[in-house]
């Protein structure tokens, strides 16, 4: 039986990476890091990426994710995906080009679980983030996009320990 691909979405500074790392450690399984953040730090110009660069992020992320999924036994814990990149493109430009739209659509069927990390934790203000106001607006954009796609998700709130416990209750059921 193939490993389950477990996706974590949420605006910047909602605890995705901490949660994914903790779950990967607990289950001794691989995790897919947020490739887009690393790419943005390296390639952004005036805090923006081009549509072509956003497409490249989604393509690189997908290739790395599929490779890690082959290595997983039970679970791959995935920190964001093409849907997040799609929402960033929508936020930056007001539209999304066809290639990224297609990758976001293909992502709709790839995950066994989708968890949305809530904004109820303190905002960590680092140079690559756009502020707490942006976090709340972007979070709503993600929620709206998930709902428009008809994707079911579990909202994770509270402390890291509470979020871990909630996810484990679903995965171990």
Q: PLM features: residue spans?
A:
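Pre-Walker A (Motif I) flank of P-loop NTPase domains
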Residues: 2-5, 73
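Hydrophobic anchor at the beta1->P-loop junction of P-loop NTPases
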Residues: 8
